[in-house]
Amino acid sequence: LFRWLGQKDGQNKVLNLPISNVPGPRERGRVGGALVTEIYSVGPLSMGSGLNITVWSYVDQLNISVLSDGSTLEDPHELTDAMINAFIEIRCAAGLSEELTVVESAMAQ
């Protein structure tokens, strides 16, 4: 469905890459008494646009979601790896360590 929408009517005349930046809560929340450790978000692919980047925060985490149809990116990890490398370059230019903080997921692997 996403691939079909991305190809329908050619290129979108209004936009071709939606990017959303959503600041999240700065303190951990609870749902039914359970501590919320992570929040996941993703934006939709729209007609004529085969790529969506969504960025959001939760407490001390910065999260990035990349959604793509197969004709735009065969492997979305190519884009996310490039983002990580660019982020490391920015950290180094700012005089910070290139080592990124890894947050262990609470979800079962």
How does the language model describe each region?
Residues 1-109:
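Acyl-CoA-dependent O-acyltransferases
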